[in-house]
Each structure stands twice: as structure tokens, then as C-alpha cells.
A protein has these predicted regions:
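Residue-identity detector for glycine
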Residues: 49, 61, 94, 105-107, ...
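Iron-sulfur-associated redox domains of electron-transfer enzymes in respiratory
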Residues: 1-13, 23-27, 35, 150-233
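Fe-S ferredoxin-like electron-transfer domains
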Residues: 2-135, 141, 148-149, 153-160, ...
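Hydrophobic transmembrane alpha-helix bundles
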Residues: 77-87, 145, 188-189, 208-214
Length: 233
């Protein structure tokens, strides 16, 4: 059979149907197959309500998965102080691989093995803490299913706030005071520092600092040290 019989060349007045009953069935089957080898602990997942796979399942009408999950459960990597990697939630989209390599320039994680055994992992399946990972969190930002997520310390923070013997201080980085607004419908680029300070104080934080204030103190201290060295010479 020649190659031409498989091709559909573009032509005038050609109509392409992208949402027929058959196409809908194919989409539903693809999502079912993804879910069949996927962790289904949605209620306790950090991405619950924001998961791309969960949203697609609702959209295409997957109410039950007909296939059994025969995938071996992988160990969760919690070695990093900032990143948690759960291979059981990975759908092999490759977003984290491209982000780490092409944007961050580190290439800490990549695809390993082939076929049904394929997975995303650091070289030689090392724990993240033993790799060149800098904990930037960009892989977690692009991950659609919480296969890579930011390590949360919410419980520890609340325990510290409720302990009267502990003075709890928050420090806000310049990027955070602008980027945090995206999650609350605030126009992009708007400085939310005042809102952040108010919210943190209401929550129970004793003091809130801007990182730039610390930078000013550092410059002053280093200038003092530099002047002292010049005087001693």
C-alpha cells in the first residue's frame, strides 16, 4: 500500500470534523488508559481541583475506569528539602524534562527506559538531593498532576504560630509579591505586598519582612567591613 493512501492533503472546501462521536470515544479511551496506570488518591492530592488529568476526565465523561492498575507502585522521593517527586502520578508528558533542560539549563531529570517501563527520573534513579537540583520549583509549576510538587510545611507553620514561645517571621521575595496575584484573579504585574502583609499578620505572623530590606542591610554591613579593611591597610 502506497504512502499516498494514508495522506489527506489540504484542499479548498474540505470539512474536518474534530468532535464526532467516534473522536469523543477515542478521547475517552485515551484518558481511561492514562487513569488505569495512575494514582487515584485525588482527595488527598495536592493538585486536587487543579489537576489537568482530572479536568480532562470530567470533560470527556470518564466516570469509571474499566481497566485494572497493574503498574508497580514506585517509591516517593522526599529527599529534597523543597521538591517531592511521586512517580505514581506521572503521565509522561515531558513538561518537567523540557523545563529543567531547556529553560533552567540543568537537565536533572529525563526519560528512562522504553515502552511500558518508561518513566521520568534523575540519572541512575538517584534521589533528588544527590543531583544538581537547585530546588527552583519550575518542574513543579509545569507538572499537571502533582507527580512533582512543592514540599509543604503548612502544618509546621501552624504549629509555630499557635506556640506562644515562638516568634514567627515571614520574609517575602520580590518575585512573590507580584506573582502571587495570579492565583487570586489580580491583574498581572500588580504589586500585592500590602495585601500579603495584611493576610500574614491576620494569620498570626509576628513580623513580615521584604527581602529587599535584608539586601539593604547586607550592603550596609559589607560596606562597613570593606571600609574597615581599607582603614587597616
Amino acid at each position: 500500500m502506497t504512502e499516498e493512501k494514508y495522506l489527506r492533503h489540504a484542499s479548498r472546501h474540505r470539512e474536518i470534523y474534530t468532535n464526532t462521536k467516534k473522536v469523543q470515544q477515542y478521547r475517552k479511551l485515551i484518558i481511561e488508559l492514562l487513569l488505569s496506570s495512575h494514582c487515584r488518591d485525588c482527595t488527598t492530592c495536592q493538585k486536587n481541583g487543579m489537576c489537568a488529568l482530572q479536568s480532562l476526565a470530567y470533560k470527556v465523561g470518564v466516570h469509571a475506569v474499566r481497566f485494572l492498575n497493574n503498574k508497580k507502585e514506585e517509591k516517593i522521593d522526599m529527599s529534597s528539602p523543597s521538591i517531592v517527586r511521586d512517580p505514581n502520578k506521572c503521565i509522561l508528558c515531558g513538561d518537567c524534562v523540557r523545563t529543567c533542560d531547556e529553560i533552567q539549563g540543568l537537565g536533572v531529570i529525563d526519560f528512562a527506559f522504553r515502552g511500558s517501563k518508561m518513566k521520568v527520573q534523575p540519572a541512575f534513579d538517584k534521589p533528588l538531593v544527590e543531583t544538581d537540583c537547585v530546588g527552583c520549583g519550575q518542574c513543579a509549576v509545569v507538572c499537571p498532576t502533582a507527580a512533582i510538587s512543592i514540599r509543604t510545611n503548612v502544618t509546621d507553620i501552624w504549629d509555630a504560630i499557635e506556640d506562644p514561645s515562638i516568634r514567627v517571621v515571614a520574609q517575602i521575595a520580590p518575585a512573590v509579591r507580584v506573582a502571587v496575584g495570579d492565583n487570586f484573579g489580580i491583574p498581572k504585574g500588580e504589586n500585592c505586598f500590602g495585601k500579603l502583609v495584611s493576610a500574614l499578620r491576620i494569620m498570626g505572623f509576628d513580623m513580615v519582612f521584604d527581602t529587599s530590606f535584608g539586601a539593604d542591610l547586607t550592603v550596609m554591613e559589607e560596606s562597613k567591613e570593606f571600609a574597615a579593611r581599607l582603614a587597616s591597610d
